[in-house]
Amino acid sequence: MVTFMVFGASGNLANKKTFPALFHLFKRNLVDRSSFYVLGYARSKIPIGEFRESIRESVKPDTESKQVFQDFIDRVSYFSGQYDQSSSYVEFRKHLESVEKKADSSKALRIFYIALPPSVYVTVSSHIYENLYLPGKSRLVIEKPFGKNYQSAVKLKEEVHKHWKEEEIYRIDHYTAKDMVNNFFTLRFANSSSIDAVLNRHSIQSVEIHMYETGGCEGRIGYYDANGVVRDVVQNHLTQIFCIAAMNEPKSASASDVRAEKVNLLKATRPASLKESMLGQYTTSEDGKIPGYLDLEGVPKDSKATTFAASTLHVDNDRWKGVPFVFVSGKRMKKGEVYIKYYFRLKDSGIFSDVKRRRYLILHVQPEEFVNLTCTINKPMTTDLQPIDAYASLNYNEQFKDLMKEKRDGYEILFEDAIRGDPTKFIRYDEVEYAWKIWDEILDSPKKPIPYPAGSDGPEGLEAYMKRHLGHE
């Protein structure tokens, strides 16, 4: 029996991501339908009918799924309570126990998912432990961000660890469950004698880790103005991509070995510096149709919140010493895409050393999922040597068309893993701390960010920055 409890059940994240993901687990029979229950908890007083209807609107079940959805929604309940009052949790426990009586509660597994601001993590997790915890049968699932900087992350860990064991805590970063990010782990280490063999300082000149979004900060002003782009996506999403892109091969695919290698990489990475970073903030678009960040309602007119960041990291280990990793991320960019790009070194001697066009391997995460390798071939239908560019490409949507029809959301995958007790894709406490250590210096720069028009390619000087730090034209 699994009871999946959602704290923050009336919030935007729960509505958009959590409940649709739980429904799809149910629909795909990835949980035992006869003993799976979802309990929502929030402060809002919402009638159960209204709560269930909001989930229906979010899931939008098609005709074929209507009966399955009805079976699912019949197993969803809602409880209104305070987050900081023990009496609310005592009453909720009665509700929980009444639900668990419907199945074999001796085999009950309780998943406590906190979809709330980090400021209440300690309070809520403490009350959960004191009132709802079942020894050996409880898992705490926490959303990012895990703190605001290194110091606060350490303090948060210490407070949560007063009650919860590390092996009971599942810290979510949904980027770890994206198909291409997962596939890249396999692509590297299942092909260690070919692909992974050239991913090192001897063959690679530089690496770009890129996340551009076309959307702005509307609806997230309170969060964004206090945090900025580095806290929002660089310290977590892009750093997780970096780990998969640069880690050494683990001893095994076990959670402990995979996470240990990620930590080894982070420990070997020098902290980001303002000197090697470029921070920006979007302004009104050139056509005047998109408002600038400072024009948004609720934004202080002197705000220095960053909506763009480029920063270069260096890894002091044998594999990557001397290879710059350039992270670049921005809101309201001209084109939205996420990718990892390895730039190969040019030949410095021998045949074709006069060919100076840069070759690269790109792993494209979104919006499309594909792998591209550029290489040099001889121009077809010629008798002499005429080297030209060619591309070897693997497009996931084309090659795995049937499988991709049932594309799974990252949250669905992570919730399934949490229920199964597989922590591999979740973030261990030392990963969190080392990641904050890397980015601490550039989190709250006193400098005014460089302006760039919404819908553009970024701040003035970015092209020169990229050429300088990637080490090529």
From Swiss-Prot:
NADP(+) 2 binds at K341. The lineage of its organism: Eukaryota, Fungi, Dikarya, Ascomycota, Taphrinomycotina. Keywords: Carbohydrate metabolism, Cytoplasm, Glucose metabolism, NADP, Oxidoreductase. The active site is at H237 (proton acceptor). It catalyses: D-glucose 6-phosphate + NADP(+) = 6-phospho-D-glucono-1,5-lactone + NADPH + H(+). It is found in: Cytoplasm. Pathway: Carbohydrate degradation; pentose phosphate pathway; D-ribulose 5-phosphate from D-glucose 6-phosphate (oxidative stage): step 1/3. One of its GO terms (molecular function) is NADP binding. GO terms for cellular component: cytosol. Catalyzes the rate-limiting step of the oxidative pentose-phosphate pathway, which represents a route for the dissimilation of carbohydrates besides glycolysis. The main function of this enzyme is to provide reducing power (NADPH) and pentose phosphates for fatty acid and nucleic acid synthesis. One of its GO terms (biological process) is pentose-phosphate shunt, oxidative branch. It comes from Schizosaccharomyces pombe (strain 972 / ATCC 24843) (Fission yeast). HAMAP family: G6PD. This is Probable glucose-6-phosphate 1-dehydrogenase C7.13c. D-glucose 6-phosphate binds at K144, H174, Y175, T176, A177, K178, E213, D232, K331, Q366. It comes from the Eukaryota. SUPFAM superfamilies: Glyceraldehyde-3-phosphate dehydrogenase-like, C-terminal domain, NAD(P)-binding Rossmann-fold domains. NADP(+) 1 binds at R43, Y121, K144.
